[in-house]
Amino acid sequence: MNCTFLDDNIIRIGDNALIAPNVQIYTAFHPTNAIDRFGVPKEDGSFEFCKTQTAPVIIGNNVWIGGGAIIMPGVTIGNNVVIGAGSVVTKDVPDNVIAYGNPCRVVRENK
């Protein structure tokens, strides 16, 4: 319910994954430099806009992503992982852990 999947690249979701409401998964991002992001005017008056960059998101098996979590481009979430509600996942998460926060970080092992 109310999830957003921006799939300009691959989003691979493993078996038995549970994705709670309002989760956002992004595969696209823009340059941080303003000129690169907004484009450069050409001699003819037209604009050359930036190209969106993308990176895949991989979600392992037996993963639970809590409500309102945001998964950023290029992230891999391992198997048997719990991502806490409201987390912002900016880096890979290894197998068999519970992770949460902004930014998301491993808190403990998931046995």
Where are the language model's segments positioned?
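C-terminal/domain-terminus segments
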Residues: 70-104
